[in-house]
From Swiss-Prot:
It holds the Pfam family Ribosomal_L28. Belongs to the bacterial ribosomal protein bL28 family. This is Large ribosomal subunit protein bL28. The keyword Ribosomal protein applies. The lineage of its organism: Bacteria, Pseudomonadati, Campylobacterota, Epsilonproteobacteria, Nautiliales. The keyword Hydrolase does not apply. GO terms for molecular function: structural constituent of ribosome. SUPFAM superfamilies: L28p-like (SSF143800). GO terms for cellular component: ribonucleoprotein complex; ribosome. GO terms for biological process: translation. It comes from Nautilia profundicola (strain ATCC BAA-1463 / DSM 18972 / AmH). Keywords: Ribonucleoprotein, Ribosomal protein.
Amino acid sequence: MARKCEICGKGPQFGNRVSHSNRKTRHKFNPNIQSVRIEINGVSRKVKICTSCLRSLKKSV
């Protein structure tokens, strides 16, 4: 379950790197995953979440 957000399920996406001469090579875009200790139902737990979910959590508190 590496490189996947435990809250929203956001995972890697695939695309191309495009050079100036328009050659294309496959590339994987990983989400920005951070390990954060948060409290869920009164229990402190370490979860891997993306930064957009982390931002939403901080705004809701």
